[in-house]
Amino acid sequence: AVRSVNTPAAPGVGHQFAYLPDVAHTMAELLDRRDTLPAFASFHMAGHWDATGCALAEAVQRAVVRRGGAAPAIQPFPWWLVRLASPFVTTFRELLGMRYLWQQPARLDNRRLVQQLGHEPHTPLDEAVEATLVGLGCLSQTATPATWTGREARS
């Protein structure tokens, strides 16, 4: 069961992210056109823009509630713990090096991608979050608000 969601962003700092199936679909479409693209062409996706740094966590809350669960608490990510353990855990040290991405907004421009493809594959946020939670085993694939019993969270 999803009981809490940790948000790494500083309060009020926007963040951009993409749903991996949308990224895969975009890459496949670009590969289909590779013969017409310049060498080393680069494209950016707009993905989902979270202006407040909380939209993703709030989407997780909505998905859990839609499936009959209690809304998980939204909590700040424990950066202090990452800093404390970073001398001993390489991954944490590397994570600290990326923290700046959560402390200032950064937004990519997808105009070149849209010019090339005519669109950007984009799954609605709530649909993407719910599918991700199901895929990760955080939500039951079959549970719905009408059928959710709580047993799904323990299986």
Predicted regions, residues:
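Mid/C-terminal beta-alpha module of Rossmann-like enzyme folds, strongest
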Residues: 26-95, 130-133, 139-155
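Short linear loop/turn motifs
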Residues: 102-104, 124-134
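Conserved C-terminal active-site "lid" loop/helix of NAD(P)H-dependent oxidoreductases
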Residues: 20, 42, 82-120
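Conserved short-loop catalytic and cofactor-binding motifs
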Residues: 11-14, 44, 48, 101, ...
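A conserved pocket-lining segment of Rossmann-fold NAD(P)-dependent short-chain dehydrogenase/reductase
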Residues: 1-18, 22, 26-29, 38
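Residue-level signal for the nucleotide or nucleotide-sugar donor/cofactor binding architecture
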Residues: 15-21, 51, 108, 123
